[in-house]
């Protein structure tokens, strides 16, 4: 409750300065207000230009004076992300997208190119936040950290168009497209597939060429099950957990096919994970899925289930604490895309002045 009261008070203060702005203008004003609240200077090109952003900074400075908050590295990243989004008219859902949330997305290596991620070097290895589903805004469940190179190459591509890049590279025997190899484009395709609703059969046929990034929402239950089983190998005690999971499966035929799949996956992972670092262990799992036998046996197992059964298995496994540190949080279809602004393809909705205020108040209730 104290956090909600703080937000309500802050919105009330902003309303005194910006009572009649369009939604996009108000978003800019609130962003400037937060720049002032954390005493972070606007980039030079925007500091002198008349805009709701600069108005928000001035109003915030008049309100807070020297009573400002500490600007941590993640606060600065949060402000930078919001500025980048506002300049393009993209929406940012601010109830869940916080500096702490962005911190939880951090990884040591790019999931697409696998290069070590840098920070503020102006190189293509610099870490960036990608909207995995391009027709959605910056919202919880739709974000992943990757290199600037991978982010720029991915652009507006989704699952099917990324697959087409793979097919073109292979058909024309190209070294790559837009700086990514066929193998890297295949990872982009799988990453995008996580947040796009697919039929159960189609999702069952996809190899897990990239493990889901932290906090990403998986729309297809069979892929969530695929990731859950694969990630067992990232933590000690996997043998006992996998045996207990097998007991949850409906019938001997399904159990037999699951065991056949796992025995195809396991030796390939163990062979590829001689280094005991987290990122190399993840890569070993991802690379094991490149083996046709692994994918064939997975599809044979998974197609004996339906989406509802996959989801039920995950709920049962979570109840028995078989997650190996993986947090499973089911969402309804509506909750899964809350704040994504799919209706406006990820752009700030065009409402009349005061519209955003009413929406924010509804979110707080």
Located regions from the model:
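Histidine-centered nuclease catalytic patch
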Residues: 88-102, 106-148, 153-158
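C-terminal, charged low-complexity interaction regions
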Residues: 203-365
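Polybasic, low-complexity binding patches
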Residues: 132-144, 152-199
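Catalytic cores of phosphodiester-bond-cleaving enzymes
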Residues: 33, 37, 56-57, 63, ...
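DEDD superfamily 3′-5′ metal-dependent exonuclease/proofreading module
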Residues: 45, 64, 68, 175-179, ...
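N-terminal alpha-helical interaction blocks
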Residues: 2-79
